[in-house]
Amino acid sequence: MITKISLILFAVLLVSGLEEEERWKRSLQPGAPNVNNNDQPWQVSPHISRDDSGNTKTDINVQRHGENNDFEAGWSKVVRGPNKAKPTWHIGGTHRWRRSLQPGAPNINNKDQPWQVSPHISRDDNGNTRTNINVQRHGENNDFEAGWSKVVRGPNKAKPTWHIGGTHRWRRSLQPGAPNVNNKDQPWQVSPHISRDDSGNTRTNINVQRHGENNDFEAGWSKVVRGPNKAKPTWHIGGTHRWRRSLQPGAPNVNNKDQPWQVSPHISRDDSGNTNTDINLQRHGENHDFDAGWSKVVRGPNKAKPTWHVGGTYRWRRSVDIPHASTDNVDETFWEFDPHTEDDDDKPVLRLRRSDDEDEEEEEDQPWQLNPNIARGDDGNTRADVNIKRRGENHDFEAGWSKVVDGPDRAKPTWHVGGTFRW
């Protein structure tokens, strides 16, 4: 009976349009105020579908987004097919508020509600009813997050899981007037965290990060301190250094980036006891990108030969630059010359390009790009591949070729060619 009633409700809702959303104001009186500049804080989304296994599934979701409160609920059921079963559902929401209730309490980061709580309850396909609640606070120098979850009914009923963590941001230099770095007052931040998972393991971890103008740093430590998977800790240390290849004063910026080159060394220890070292080198230029990396397990049960990769990208227009070109024998209705002078050369260069209006409206100056790459993997195979792409206004094109040139899986190459036409 309940199933029949639900199907009737779906039929009524779907009259206005299948798989569409209906949004409305709960208050229909003229002049009802907007909430967060949204005219429709409430919305309902009915849906019905049939999958590859022959199951017909119906579901409906209701949402409301308000100034201080959010609400969400949903119901889903396979009404016909081999997987027909009891429905699943969920109900939850979020409430935001200030910890200080005094009038005139200051905003933090332009947020009126630094605190928020989100309770939730749901039933899954296995018949488990799960409840959980999360509390968050986002402040100027500190963030906090805690959560609790438990299967209160069903075959997987067990002890609850939980987590507590946060982030503290600060300057390494505590002197008054210490300069901002990249418009960030706190280049340093530390994030401690502790949690308990479904297997009964209690894990603690801490991460430290610094984001600077030319250097980034990151380090972390994690350990299961209690439970069946208690073991030695894991850790990682790494960073990034950015610099110009040209060290002369006044070297030009590339794509508004002062440091087109960057190197990122890293070392870590995983759960299996392997210590892995790797280093990556990248360059991002106007017409060229370059990427290379090297990685090796230097200690542990999986110690082996290193892996590596080298690749890049070249972007260009289909019509290339022609130095000292003339306009003789050129169809002016289809082609035009664009005078162009290089910064490091007084000789004029004429760029040949299509004179179509859409050429000037293209967001990218180089719709074509070529990506060669070669790499060696953990299995000892050295693979070479090359890809070519073009992104146009109405047409996209892509082609690629790949081959294992050395190693146990050496074989004939693979390739692909495809595209997209929009109209």
From Swiss-Prot:
**What GO CC terms are in its UniProt record?**
extracellular region
Tell me a GO biological process for this protein: defense response to bacterium
Tissue expression, per UniProt? Hemolymph (at protein level). Larval fat body.
Superkingdom of origin? Eukaryota
Ranges of Basic and acidic residues compositional bias? Answer: 376-385
Could you tell me which InterPro entries the record lists for this protein? Coleoptericin (IPR009382)
Free-text function comment from the UniProt entry: Acaloleptins A1-A4 show antibacterial activity against Gram-negative bacteria but not against Gram-positive bacteria. Acaloleptin A5 shows antibacterial activity against Gram-positive bacteria but not against Gram-negative bacteria, and may also have antifungal activity.
Q: Which family is annotated?
A: Belongs to the coleoptericin family.
Q: What is this protein called?
A: Acaloleptin A
